[in-house]
C-alpha cells in the first residue's frame, strides 16, 4: 500500500483526523448526495463537515449465527465503544496544534449528528432487540432519497413519517434501489 501511494505522490497516515488541514482545505467527492449531506451537516451539529472531509477509519464486519447472537454482539460492541476509542486513539493533533484530546476523531463523532450518532440507552441494555434499532432508525430524517432517477432532499420528515405517508413526499420502492447506469452513477 505504501508503494502504491508513493507512486501517486501520496503517503499513508495512520491517523483518525487530518493533523493539519481543515474541511475548508480538503475536497469533497463530487456526488450530489455528498453535497446534500455536507450542506446539511452544518445545520445539525458542529463537526459533521469534519467527519465527512477530515477523518478516516476502519470498519470491521462481524458475522452472527442468529438474531439473538446479532443482538448480543451489538450490545457488547456498543458497550466497548469507549474502550475501543481509547485503545485506538490516534488523533491528538488538530490544525497543527495539540487538540487536548487523544482521540479528536471521537470528539468529531460525538458532535456530528445527534440523530444518527451516539449511543441510545436501549443500545446498551441487556433487553435490547433489533426492534429497538428499527424504532430508532425510523425516527431519523434521511438526508436524501433516490427518487425517479434523482437524488432528492426529503425535507424535515423522518423515515416513519414518509412511510406512513404523513407528508406530500411518499416513501416508495425506488427510494431503496440503486442502479449502476452511468447517468445515475453521476448523480448518485
Regions found by a protein language model. Give the residues of each.
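Conserved small/polar residues in nucleotide/adenosyl-binding loops
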Residues: 178-184
